[in-house]
Structures are given as C-alpha cells and as structure tokens.
Amino acid sequence: MAASTSGYSGVLFRLRKYANKSQSLCHIGNSNFIIRTTWTTGCKHQHQLNTQIESLPQMVGVVGLEIHAQIHSKSKLFSGSHVSFSDPPNSLVSHFDASLPGTLPVLNRRCVEAAVLTGLALNCTINKKSLFDRKHYFYADMPAGYQITQQRLPIAVNGTLSYSHFEGRKRNHVVTKSVKIKQIQLEQDSGKSLHDDERSQTLIDLNRAGVGLMELVMEPEMCCGEEAGAAVRELQLILQALGTCQANMAEGQLRVDANVSVHHPGEPLGVRTEVKNINSVRHLAKAIDYEIQRQMEVLQSGGTVLNETRAFDSKSGITIPMRDKEGLQDYRFMPEPNLPPLFVYESEASVPAGADSTQLVLIDRLSSQLPELPSVTRTRLVETYGILREHSFTLVNEDGLVDYFESVVKMTKTEPRKVIGWVMNELMGNLNLQNLKVSQSPVSPCALAEMINLVRSGHISSSTAKKVFQEMWKTPEKTVEQIVKEQDLWMINDKEELRQICQRIVDSHSEEVQIIRGGNKKVLNKLMGEIQKETKGKTNPLQVKAILEEMIF
C-alpha cells in the first residue's frame, strides 16, 4: 500500500479547521471537497484530526467488525457456574473455570441454541456439524493458557445483516445497506485483569472466565463510522429481540473490534489496523472515523500504515497504539481433544434412530421460535399506523416503546399519527430529561390514552393537555380527571358563557375592532389571544373565532 501511494507523497494539501460541522468519511471523491460534510447527529464526531483535506486523490475507508456477544444464559459455556455482572470477584468460579487438573468441559445446550437462533435471524447457513478448537494465549486472565473456540468449522456461516442510517440535514432520508456475516462461532470469554495503579499490581477476577460468547465476524464492506455504528445498533436490537444476548455494551455484554484500512478504489486493500474493545456505538463511530482519517494523513505525508493493534481514548477522541502485530502471532490452533463434534439437526425426521429428539438441537424447532425482528416491526408500524419511518426507528430503538405506543392506540380512537406526537414529544422528552427507561415512566399507557381521549372529545384543549401531562408525571397516583377538576381545566363549551367572554373582549378593544372592520382581519388573532389568556386556554379557537366574527361583522 505504501508503494502504491508514494507517488502522491509530494502532493501539497491544506488542513483546515472545520468548526461546528461533522465529517463523514463514507465517500471520498476526487474533487476539491474530498470529505463530505454532513449535518447529522449520527456522525457528529469532532476530534484532533477534525479537518478537511483538499486536492487529495480519491481514497476510501474500509471497515470490518469482529463482535463478541455474551450469551444470555444462567450458566457458563462449559461449566455450571452462574453468570452475573455484579457479583463479588472470584465468587462465580468452578474448578473447570480455574483450569484445575482433571476437570472436563460440559457443553451448555442453551448456548448452542442461542447461536443457532442468532444464525437463523442473520440469514446464516447453520452447519449441521461444527468443531471446537484450542486457541493458545498466555494471559493471566485465561488460566488454561488457551481459549476453546471454533476456528476450523464454526456453527454458522455466510449470513447477512441489513441496517439503516439517516442522511440529510433533517435526518429524514433513510439509507438501507447490508453487510455479509462471515461466521458465528461459539467460544469462551476470558476473565478480567483489574489494574491497581496505587499499588502497582494487577488483580485477576475469573467470574467472567468461561462465559459463553458468540463471535460474529462482519466482512470489510462498510466505509465509515456511521455505517459501522448503525450495523452494530441493528445487531443489538436483533440480539435483544431474540433474547440471546442482552447486548449492554456498558457491562461488556457486547464488545466490538474494528478492522480499519484505506485504499484507492481498484487497488488491493491497504494495511489494516485493529481498534480493540470499543464499548459504545458512539465511541465505535468516532474511533473508526478518526482512524480512517489518521491513515489517510499518514499515507499522504509519505509514511506507512503499520499493521498494529490500537485502543480508542474516549477522552481525547484518538486511537493510540497497543501492541505491534507485524510479527504474525502463532495461536497454535489445535482440535479440542475433550469435546466431540457438535451436531445439530434440521428436524425430527433427520434425527438418528433411537435418539431422543427432546435432548437434541433441532433447527426447525428453533426457527419456529423466532420473534418479530426489528426490521419487520418497523415496516409493520409504518404500514399499520401510517407513521413516519423515522418514528418507527425511535419506537423500535427504545425498549418497550412499541408496546407502549400500541397500547395507547388500542385505548383511544384518535389517529395513530396524533398519538405518536404525544409519545415522541411529551413522553420521550420527559424520559430523556430524567434518563429513565420506558418501563420507569410514571405515566402509564392507560393514563395517556385517557388524556388523549379528553382532547379528542373536546373536554380539554391540546395546550391544556400538555399541562395535564406534566401534572400526571409529577403525581402519577392521581387520575386525569382528578387533575383536570382540581385545576379547573375543563374546556368552556357553554355558548352563552363564551359569548359573554367574547363580548367583554370586544368592548375593551374598540380600536382593534375598528381596524378589523376596516379589512385587517389579522388583528382578529390578537382578540382571540386575549380570550385564550383570560380563559387560560380553555376555549376552542374555532368556536371563539366564529363568535367574534359574528359580533364584529
């Protein structure tokens, strides 16, 4: 790669600060504007290399991902030890986890079923026979000196993941792409090394050692941080829908390694770097965009990109070297002698004679258990309720929000597109403000539906309903009607009372009335505003307008 770019080493280019704009490295053209500037929140990454390169020959980023998803299971992959994130250190360690001599692995069926389910959801081919291997490491948090994995013949191969991200200044243009899944393999997690800087020592916690992982390898078909982030977010939603992984990145249940390189289209891929253990989608996108731009600048200055492992520093927004990978590490893969081949079967008809099918993993049985996947849910929401596509993404992205929305719709005759406004603006606004989950909302779907029904029936106005919602949020023990009664928020629907109010306003604004009679009907809005102020928003604007026009004209 260095040789192919040496001809460009003398090219002069400027680095220009680009304030308040994010940069997308997804597409790099050969015009003056090499890096396309976007105004989206999805790729809003500012870092030390936040620059725009001009007069640069065409170059693109290439991104592949390796994702380690911790299987949601009560016990570990090869032992009966319990799985928990918050238990005291070294309290969940069996003899096998600690690699005591004479202990043997016993495969957890739940982990196999989770891998098959995930493979089916990602359109993979499930291998009826897969094999286990030993991958040798010499790390203190892996006491056996090796990891049991599936290097030769993994449980699932050749899948695809479709994902979407938004483009455009208003984030309303949905772009859908797909990436190939090379393989899904079962393997053990390692323990944790906890560094104590004050005492200059490293402590080992083996609670995580032996926990079941699915390693998903995505082909290098993405081109920027936004695409990679969208793919990982979609995978998170799929795993959570399946129940095969809780996918909480903050707790290490989903860890991502990004393989990043740059090259000129039509030429071989460049030397790649691996950015390890990224623990959030936002950091993933930032790390990839930084690394792509860093490599471009290295090549443009006549340097060579090293094949190395790097870490992302979230505080400074840069990647830093960890260890050199130029010398290919020999993991000394070998077949796992203590585990036979793993067989799964298509259906009961393919089960060997005399075998108990209830004790076997059947693909068609698991296929029948597949839930509605996020992409299908989004399509259904748009087609069934007529909501905007971007709203369907928000509903699906928030755990429990689809059920909340559909419950409200069922309990009210109001158009779903009006219901979505209350859910997106009032409900989500308050949840985000207080950093709460949907399940923690003090306003239940039933209460919100009751309030929306009062608006629809004309008993309270939309502006009043917003005040009522805030009271419902503060005092969830009160019903909607209690709040409306206590604060006297019922709409004034009595025509005689409305006429009296309108007459008072007309009498006290004689100058405005003359202007209106002179042909300037816009001033009528001022009188309507005065009435709304006097009644605290408890009048119907259409009714008020009709009465005022009758009185004035």
Swiss-Prot record:
Entry EC no(s): 6.3.5.-
Gene3D superfamilies the record matches: 1.10.10.410
Any one of the GO CC terms: glutamyl-tRNA(Gln) amidotransferase complex
Signal peptide feature range: none
Gene Ontology molecular function, alphabetical: ATP binding; glutaminyl-tRNA synthase (glutamine-hydrolyzing) activity
Gene Ontology terms describing biological process: glutaminyl-tRNAGln biosynthesis via transamidation; mitochondrial translation
Transit peptide, from-to: 1-18
Catalytic activity reported: L-glutamyl-tRNA(Gln) + L-glutamine + ATP + H2O = L-glutaminyl-tRNA(Gln) + L-glutamate + ADP + phosphate + H(+)
Pfam families xref list: GatB_N (PF02934), GatB_Yqey (PF02637)
Domain of life: Eukaryota
Keywords recorded for this protein, A-Z: ATP-binding, Ligase, Mitochondrion, Nucleotide-binding, Protein biosynthesis, Transit peptide
Location of the protein in the cell: Mitochondrion
Residue intervals passing through the bilayer: none
Family in the record: Belongs to the GatB/GatE family. GatB subfamily.
Stored PANTHER family: GLUTAMYL-TRNA GLN AMIDOTRANSFERASE SUBUNIT B MITOCHONDRIAL AND PROKARYOTIC PET112-RELATED (PTHR11659), GLUTAMYL-TRNA(GLN) AMIDOTRANSFERASE SUBUNIT B, MITOCHONDRIAL (PTHR11659:SF0)
Described purpose of this protein according to its UniProt entry: Allows the formation of correctly charged Gln-tRNA(Gln) through the transamidation of misacylated Glu-tRNA(Gln) in the mitochondria. The reaction takes place in the presence of glutamine and ATP through an activated gamma-phospho-Glu-tRNA(Gln).
Oligomeric and partner information: Subunit of the heterotrimeric GatCAB amidotransferase (AdT) complex, composed of A (qrsl1), B (gatb) and C (gatc) subunits.
Protein name: Glutamyl-tRNA(Gln) amidotransferase subunit B, mitochondrial
Originating organism: Danio rerio
Annotated gene: gatb
